[in-house]
Amino acid sequence: MPATALLPEPAAERVLPTLNQDGTRRWLRPKLSRGRFFRRRRGLAWVLIALFALIPYLRMNGKPLILLDVVRRQFTLFGTTFLPTDTVLLMLLLVGIFLAIFWLTAVYGRVWCGWACPQTVYMEFLYRPIERLIEGGSRAQSDLDRRGWALRRLVKHAVFVGLSMFLAHTFLAYFVGVEELRRWVTRSPVEHPAAFLVMATTTALMFLDFGWFREQVCMVACPYGRLQSVLLDRRSLIVGYDAQRGEPRGTHRDRRASRDDLAATRAGDSPGARVMVTGDSPGAVAFGDCIDCGACVVTCPTGIDIRQGLQMECIHCTQCMDACDAVMDRIGRPPGLIRYSSKDQLQGEPGRILRPRVVVYPLLVLLVWGALGVALAHRAPAEITVLRGLGSPFTLLPSGDVSNQLRVKIVNRGSEERHYRIQLAEDAILRLVAPDTPLPVGGGKSATATVFVIAPRSAFVHGQRDIRLHVEDEAGFGAATPYRLMGPSQ
């Protein structure tokens, strides 16, 4: 992995911060800036890392707090289980989540990316600290890049593999549950080769992500950054460079040279020389506060120059803010040359808190989440579906009666097993034969009972008769489902 300079190529020639002009990988070794925002992010990251690991073990209403059981097609969120038949509920849930993301982005920009996204949290507060601990700072890492593979780098990757294995198990716990994961871990891989293959593949993907692909996930794979052009407006919160305060840039050497030139000009030693000073002398061209030190560039984990304006690659991690504030403090200038602001405010225009999308998005979020809450409150503890039996629609019995075979599918939405009894609702001339009743159905599972409804030929009008099947359990649930029997025409 050959190292290249951390300073970016000119914007007109650069495709991605992680690519050189010839298309080869440009490895980023960002310098850590320990400022006030970094300390806040680090504290939040430690809480999130612990929370991400604990969530699969937490339970609510007797169910996992979050379990995305793809195999059984059941999604449990905050103690509520969504089944494949809950199409409307799932639609409301997803729409509500996306609208909440749109609202958050419109108001606070990409605060999720820089502060709470698992990719950023694990990369910047788990993998990079371990990398710095083993290989050293950004300069030492660049030296290792030039030297090629070394023992330190082998040790780092070995630690990365172990860490990726732990994260893979944590990740899989969200999809298979901690009980199933415990069985995988305590049994030999020979007994469950498919599960072992899933774990090994997930570990490899984790290692590939955090050990090799790294910041390119945010720039190439994640669509969120590309959506910011439509999710943000000129008044959204961003990490921005105050060009009005910082320009024109000038290094310490430029500033010293300008002072020397001015002194020489005033002394008459250099008639007609260009006068540039940092003060407010009449006729002088003053430098801005930016000393063009590049600290904001070498500390950026995605390799951009924030002074070029808002960019897709910026994840609002605030590292450039901490780096710039430290420089401003050293040169005796006020902090905030790079700060949280909006495009309008950075250009000297007044900011507006209330604007259409900031009003419309929360109203839509309240509407959708309110509809979801009402739907969940009125959702029955079981779902009953009556289907026609296989084969002919009806059968003529030797006694002259007509038999209809029905299949009653019962989905138990609760967490405990229930026993369901199937009956005919108030129809004296019909008879129900239900060999499978009461039907036991486990929590979160479904079962189908086959029943027969026997009726005399005289019960049918134009070959049809409407009935109602009543299904109830021992916990007090009861539901009547309409159904139309088929029979011979009179």
Each PLM stretch: what is its role?
Residues 105-120, 210-225, 247-250, 280-328:
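Cysteine-centered iron-sulfur cluster-binding motifs in ferredoxin-type domains/subunits
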Residues 432-458:
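Intrinsically disordered, low-complexity Pro/Gly/Ser/Thr-rich segments with frequent PxxP/GP/PP motifs
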Residues 455-490:
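Terminal connector regions
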Residues 416-424, 464, 481:
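Short, hydrophobic/aromatic beta-strand segments
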Residues 426-432:
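Short, solvent-exposed loop/linker segments at beta-strand-coil boundaries, enriched for Pro/Gly
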Residues 410-414:
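Asparagine-centered strand-capping/turn motif at beta-strand->loop junctions
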Residues 1-265, 272-273, 334-366:
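Membrane-embedded alpha-helical bundles of multi-pass integral membrane proteins
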Residues 370-394:
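Hydrophobic alpha-helical transmembrane segments in integral membrane proteins
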